[in-house]
UniProtKB/Swiss-Prot annotation:
<dbReference type="InterPro" id="IPR003720">
    <property type="entry name" value="tRNA_STrfase"/>
</dbReference>
<dbReference type="InterPro" id="IPR049962">
    <property type="entry name" value="THUMP_ThiI"/>
</dbReference>
<comment type="similarity">
    <text>Belongs to the ThiI family.</text>
</comment>
<dbReference type="GO" id="GO:0009228">
    <property type="term" value="P:thiamine biosynthetic process"/>
</dbReference>
<dbReference type="InterPro" id="IPR014729">
    <property type="entry name" value="Rossmann-like_a/b/a_fold"/>
</dbReference>
<dbReference type="Pfam" id="PF02568">
    <property type="entry name" value="ThiI"/>
</dbReference>
<feature type="binding site">
    <location>
        <begin position="209"/>
        <end position="210"/>
    </location>
    <ligand>
        <name>ATP</name>
    </ligand>
</feature>
<dbReference type="Pfam" id="PF22025">
    <property type="entry name" value="ThiI_fer"/>
</dbReference>
<feature type="binding site">
    <location>
        <begin position="184"/>
        <end position="185"/>
    </location>
    <ligand>
        <name>ATP</name>
    </ligand>
</feature>
<feature type="binding site">
    <location>
        <position position="288"/>
    </location>
    <ligand>
        <name>ATP</name>
    </ligand>
</feature>
<dbReference type="GO" id="GO:0009229">
    <property type="term" value="P:thiamine diphosphate biosynthetic process"/>
</dbReference>
<dbReference type="Pfam" id="PF02926">
    <property type="entry name" value="THUMP"/>
</dbReference>
<comment type="pathway">
    <text>Cofactor biosynthesis; thiamine diphosphate biosynthesis.</text>
</comment>
<dbReference type="InterPro" id="IPR020536">
    <property type="entry name" value="ThiI_AANH"/>
</dbReference>
<keyword id="KW-0820">tRNA-binding</keyword>
<feature type="domain" description="THUMP">
    <location>
        <begin position="61"/>
        <end position="166"/>
    </location>
</feature>
<dbReference type="InterPro" id="IPR004114">
    <property type="entry name" value="THUMP_dom"/>
</dbReference>
Length: 404
């Protein structure tokens, strides 16, 4: 095995000043959590980069596959090592460059000599390795500025280290470095994408889903569980709070005029979410709303909905159009699950002509004739909580159940 370690370059952490080490510690914890199945990882941190020691090829492959999903990483590189003699360096350089034989590339060799006792200076090492590698590959040509491949060589005190591949990371900030919020997870396309974007900004998420049996099926709930589980691959556990919402929706249908019933439904959801948020110690509520996309997402509707709380409502998709949201959903792997045709509570009892510019005072007047507070308290108390990611044995049980 030639691979010795993985070098990780930080994303926005490089701009964080005195708080930088807190962000780095959070990133290290998230990496350990994401790869807990690999056992204890040996991670060394520096102010501008992080190193993960590699023990075998299987571990290396798992890390290379999973690290691009961890927020806070700008890029990373597999690093190989060899003895500190020119012959070993040349042979390692050939081995690394063998992986770039598929098409024409420009390249250069960049050398850093940390061990000043090594007899050759950096420029001499550069000429030796470059002059040895170039004749071995017909597809390579030298380019000093912005080459396709930069073979980086570092002569340290213990060994010589080399890297040539720079793999893009997810960028952003480590999940958990910017507090916790509650995501309203509907099961549609938008809300998982909103959750992803907030995680990218370092926000740890719990999720809330409104379930209205028998009007919504068990399949719709299972779909949301899959989406919650999908979001955990970006670096953290997620607790999903499932709210029994049938009583509240039936009362809205019976007592509130149909043209503002959707506004009231969203207001009651927000009231429930705010109580759960307070219980779990979250600082904000996250939604997948996009301005003007549907009747409940006009400025007038959002104003009427927001009026039930002083809690910050974060809407990362507010200026995105539907095609942009779909494209991102496809990229993060939630789209195919989101489009499964199972109704959620937002699609049942949908009025034929909902108000796009509801008046807050009228909505409050219609709601004043019903005691929603008691139903809200009961829904919060009777919620079910699921923790994701699922353990492997639980996933196997689900697959077996699908066969029955």
């Amino acid at each position: 095995m030639i691979w010795k370690e993985i070098l990780i370059r930080y994303g926005e952490l490089s701009t964080k000043g005195r708080n930088k080490m807190d962000f780095i510690r959070r990133l290290r914890e998230n990496i350990r959590h994401a790869f807990a199945d690999l056992g204890h990882l040996h991670i060394r941190t520096e102010r501008d980069r992080m190193f993960i020691a590699i023990e075998n090829d299987a571990q290396m492959q798992t890390l290379v596959t999973g690290l691009p999903k961890i927020f806070g990483i700008q890029s990373f590189s597999p690093v190989a090592a060899c003895e500190k003699d020119m012959e070993s360096m040349k042979q390692l350089a050939i081995t690394i460059m063998e992986t770039f034989k598929d098409q024409p590339y420009t390249f250069k060799v960049e050398v850093k000599r940390t061990d000043k006792t090594f007899p050759l200076e950096s420029h001499a090492i550069q000429r030796e390795i470059g002059g040895y590698v170039l004749p071995q590959f017909n597809n390579l040509s030298v380019k000093v500025k912005q080459p396709d491949i930069e073979l980086r060589v570092e002569v340290r005190h213990d060994a010589t280290y080399m890297m040539a591949q720079v793999i893009p990371g997810a960028g952003g900030m480590p999940v958990g470095s910017n507090g916790k919020s509650l995501l309203m997870l509907s099961g549609g396309i938008d809300s998982p994408v909103a959750g992803y974007l907030m995680m990218k900004r370092g926000v740890r998420l719990e999720a809330i889903h409104f379930f209205s049996p028998p009007y919504t099926s068990q399949n719709s709930l299972e779909k949301v569980k899959v989406l919650a589980n999908e979001l955990t691959k970006f670096g953290a556990n997620i607790r999903l709070h499932v709210i029994p919402f049938t009583e509240i929706q039936v009362l809205i249908k019976e007592k509130v005029p149909s043209n503002v019933s959707m506004t009231t439904t969203r207001r009651m959801m927000l009231k429930v979410a705010d109580q759960v948020r307070e219980e779990i110690g979250a600082l904000a509520i996250v939604t997948g709303e996009s301005l003007g996309q549907v009747a409940s997402q006009t400025l007038e509707s959002l104003t009427a909905i927001n009026a039930v709380t002083n809690t910050p409502i974060l809407r990362p998709l507010i200026s995105s159009d539907k095609l942009e949201i779909i494209e991102l959903a496809e990229q993060i792997g939630t789209y195919e699950t989101s489009i499964q045709p199972f109704e959620d509570c937002c699609t049942i009892f949908t009025p034929a002509s909902p108000k796009t510019k509801p008046k807050l005072e009228k909505v409050e007047h219609y709601e004043s004739f019903s005691d929603f507070d008691e139903l809200i308290a009961r829904a919060v108390k009777n919620r079910e909580v699921y923790i994701f990611p699922k353990k492997e044995e639980e996933q196997q049980q689900d697959k077996f159940a699908d066969l029955l």
